[in-house]
Amino acid sequence: MHNTQSPTIQNLEAAFAGESMAHIKYRYFAKLCRAAGDEATAKVFESTADQELLHAFGHAELLFAGETMTPFKCLQYAIKGETYEYTEMYPKFRHEAMQEGHDAAVAEIDEQIVESKEHAEMFKSVLEKAAKRFAALARVEEKHAKHYQAQQDAIAA
């Protein structure tokens, strides 16, 4: 995990969020422009969205350095993020939307709570299966190591 108190890390996280949001927003704008019959503008938005995605990946690589990230760490980050979404973020947003009478937002948030929980459970399941596979492989490797050691001992005797 990185130092979340560092201003540079906070700036990278904000830039990552902004570039990611711009990517999706511009894809959505392209869809709207295309539906309105403006193919040229749609293509400009799509091209820019592609660039925003590359910017987001650049920030992600600094935040989650590939050489330090293992599948285990990736799953941990994903579980933490999805769990935060369905236990804290979306329930708070839902409460505020209800207070303001934004029924459509409440319905959307309810769907996101369910999906975020499903995502967290999916990632947990993958992590648990990986742990079981690793444990099984460790037992096989231990058995092989003992066999090889016995063979070496027999040769040395």
Regions flagged by a language model, labelled:
Residues 1-157:
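Non-heme di-metal
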